[in-house]
Amino acid sequence: NNWGIGDFSDLAQLVTKAGKQGAGFIGLNPIHALYPSNPEACSPYGPSSRRWLNFLYIDVTALPEYTSAAVQAVVNAEDFQTRLQTARSVEYVDYSLVTELKMAALNSLFDEYYNAYLKKNTKQNREFKAFIQAGGESLEMQATYDAMQEYLQNEGKDAWGWPVFPENWRDFHNEAVAKFAKKHKKRVQFYMFLQWQAAEQLEKANQAAIAA
């Protein structure tokens, strides 16, 4: 049922089944954050961050708001379903295609979640803010980096990594970076949200492993 790449729900099922067979642990390749706007840079040994997660491992179908009409309209579109079947059927992971599919759904899902919870004083908003506070500057840096790389990519500019960013964007503490983050606040929040949901799903897999 995954979207062409193993996800955290797959992991939860695996550890449960493995535990029943007497396994004591499951080994994983690194699952660090990579480069969502440069999906072919997919080596787990060359991450953009060793603290944050690769949110392509999120099980989109397990997220809140997935069943909303807006998200369902995206994922049930004929073209989307055709590409999804392609992603599932190829011999090796097509990282670019998987990224396109997941980002299309996640963008729609975040809009729904943002309007339902993050614009108001809700339990979900408080939990999200607590995650952001716990992540501190490191999370802000990661989310801002992802948003900046995406922005440059959309502008048709070279964006494979920070060495080719505009010079005043290469240091997180530069005023230009702060201005970008403020101007694109919702987009930065989007990438923070993905880290939050990835962490939540990984913890569920961890709890499944403990229970197994």
Language-model regions: role of each:
Residues N1-A212:
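Acidic/aromatic-lined carbohydrate-recognition and catalytic surfaces
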